[in-house]
């Protein structure tokens, strides 16, 4: 893990070429009429419930609170440090999107989720997410009951799926991972200096995975990570929780 330095965020407006319409689909609110976004230099109207200004870190789309229950579908996110940030929200589905060419010193992940639940990340493509700090494909922080299924991950410097700070009951199922990861395909880490806790009951099954980002084999899972240094009292160490926080449910095969 690495430390991030804050910098002044760039303020943007999402310009919509036509009005939005809302349609019910399977009990969820799906926003239609969305074209590819065009960003300007000032804040503007939100396209999704709970959408608002982004914190420092160069995100493209930020949701903080709101009713949830909607879908982000069929978009392409590229050319920034990060793509989507979800905070304090439930029951959001992210499906059929492409996350590519994300890079920068404040890059955390393609999809960064905090303090949320019931997030579904399904049938997306994550490719060329790379920086010196090992950014991830999906990064769940204090997040529960979420599903990562049927996605493809390739050329990602950090672990393609990383969970943190008490994340529990999350599943990683039926994904394909190639040339991605520094420590594992699915890893858990916490900042014990901030009082963050171990997760629990996270699972992985029926995935296909190849070597890590540098072309060498990686373990499928690593859990109970803490620390970030190479030596000394802050040395990165695994299996520091009392019980495993991620369980291999089987059916995972190497490519």
Roles of regions detected by a PLM:
Residues 60-62, 83-84, 110, 135-137, ...:
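Structural detector of coil-to-beta-strand junctions
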């Amino acid at each position: 893990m690495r430390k991030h330095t804050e910098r002044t965020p760039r303020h943007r407006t999402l310009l919509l070429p036509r009005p939005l319409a809302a349609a019910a689909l399977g009990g969820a609110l799906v926003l239609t009429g969305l074209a590819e976004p065009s960003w300007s230099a000032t804040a503007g109207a939100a396209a999704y419930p709970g959408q608002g200004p982004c914190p420092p870190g160069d995100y493209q789309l930020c949701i903080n609170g709101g009713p949830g229950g909607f879908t982000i579908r069929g978009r392409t996110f590229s050319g920034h440090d990060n793509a989507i940030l979800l905070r304090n929200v439930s029951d959001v589905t992210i499906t059929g999107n492409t996350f590519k060419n994300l890079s920068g010193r404040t890059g955390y992940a393609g999809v960064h989720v905090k303090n949320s639940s019931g997030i579904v990340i399904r049938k997306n493509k994550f490719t060329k997410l790379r920086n010196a700090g090992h950014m991830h494909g999906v990064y769940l922080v204090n997040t529960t009951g979420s599903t990562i299924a049927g996605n493809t991950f390739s050329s990602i410097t950090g672990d393609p799926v990383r969970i943190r700070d008490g994340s529990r009951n999350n599943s990683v199922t039926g994904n394909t991972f190639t040339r991605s990861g520094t420590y594992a395909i699915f890893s858990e880490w916490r900042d014990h200096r901030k009082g963050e806790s171990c997760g629990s009951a996270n699972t992985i099954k029926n995935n296909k995975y190849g070597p890590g980002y540098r072309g060498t084999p990686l373990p499928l899972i690593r859990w109970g990570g803490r620390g970030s240094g190479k030596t000394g009292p802050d040395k990165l160490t695994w299996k520091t929780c009392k019980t495993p926080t991620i369980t291999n449910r089987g059916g995972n095969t190497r490519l």
